Amino acid sequence: MGSVKIGTRDSQLALWQAEWVKRKLEEYYPEREFVLVPMKTKGDKILDVPLAKIGDKGLFTKELEVGLLNGEIDCAVHSLKDLPTVLPPGLEIAAFCEREEPRDVFLSKDGTPLGSLPAGSIIGTSSLRRKAQLQNYRSDLSFADLRGNLQTRWRKLQESDMAGIVLAAAGVKRLGWEDRITEYISEEIMLSAVGQGAIAVEIAAQRADVREMLDLLNHGDTERAVKAERALLYRLEGGCQIPIGAWAVTEQQQIVLKGMVASLDGQRILKVTLSGEHPEELGRQAADLLIAQGALEILQEIRTPLEK
């Protein structure tokens, strides 16, 4: 058998994640050769437009998925939060790796935490989810769109009049930047994106050999938690550029799921907390409770201008 080709985006963080998967596989299968195949995705190439305006189906995944379907690569490593809830026909997730810290973090230019920033301070983020929740927490803040990899965002913070930037804790920790974190943002203030902090490995469905190999990387508690979150997102027909947050944790047999839908200005935030044993069912039930509070109306208001 030849080498196993692992597809990945070519950013430093994506390469870290793919290298982590590669090292794990080398530990389990020392007799096999594993090689990384870096690729650029559409989302990596278009950096001057906010994500919400590009549309988000497979923005950071499509090129890798084409590689899976045409046999160019054997598996693809993704940040789970970038993977749409509906995968292209013929593809599946073979492993949900153990989740890193799912919260968001604030990196302040001068060490001032979010709650103490002066009115009018500018926060760098392109995420509608982060903006909406921050506006709900502090309506006196301003925002600047911020795209690019983590190194680019950090550089832009230093070179601009932004007071700070909001990033996913997992990526910051994986790059060894813990000393740059001013604070971890409480989930009471900011619920994270669906699947945030988890690495997923995608394969072509007919590749039973690769599925079996990746089974050792799958983390059961992470799988159950993120499946509940993804079921909520699917039921709400949300994409990763819509202000929907979810965070599930497993406690013995139970899964506790928190869900959130926000209006763009953060004036309306709907929340739900629900527990159950079955991930997909729990996600659907939590979404239905949000729908009963008016979630679909909020989401339609957001989608209409984005679709024009």
Swiss-Prot record:
Q: Name one GO cellular component term.
A: cytoplasm
The EC number(s) this enzyme carries: 2.5.1.61
Catalyzed reactions per annotation: 4 porphobilinogen + H2O = hydroxymethylbilane + 4 NH4(+)
- Keywords, sorted A to Z: Porphyrin biosynthesis, Transferase
Q: Modified residue S-(dipyrrolylmethanemethyl)cysteine is at which positions?
A: 240
Disulphide-bridged cysteine pairs:
none
Pathway entry: Porphyrin-containing compound metabolism; protoporphyrin-IX biosynthesis; coproporphyrinogen-III from 5-aminolevulinate: step 2/4
Q: Which GO terms describe its molecular function?
A: hydroxymethylbilane synthase activity
- InterPro entries assigned to the protein according to its UniProt record, in alphabetical order: HemC (IPR000860), Porphobilin_deaminase_cofac_BS (IPR022419), Porphobilin_deaminase_N (IPR022417), Porphobilinogen_deaminase_C (IPR022418), Porphobilinogen_deaminase_C_sf (IPR036803)
| Cofactor dependence | dipyrromethane
Q: Please give the CDD domains that the UniProt record associates with this protein.
A: PBP2_EcHMBS_like
Cofactor binding notes? Binds 1 dipyrromethane group covalently.
HAMAP family from the UniProt entry: Porphobil_deam
Q: What does this protein do?
A: Tetrapolymerization of the monopyrrole PBG into the hydroxymethylbilane pre-uroporphyrinogen in several discrete steps.
Record family assignment: Belongs to the HMBS family.
Record's miscellaneous remark: The porphobilinogen subunits are added to the dipyrromethane group.
Q: How does it assemble?
A: Monomer.
Q: What protein name does the entry list?
A: Porphobilinogen deaminase
Gene encoding the protein? hemC
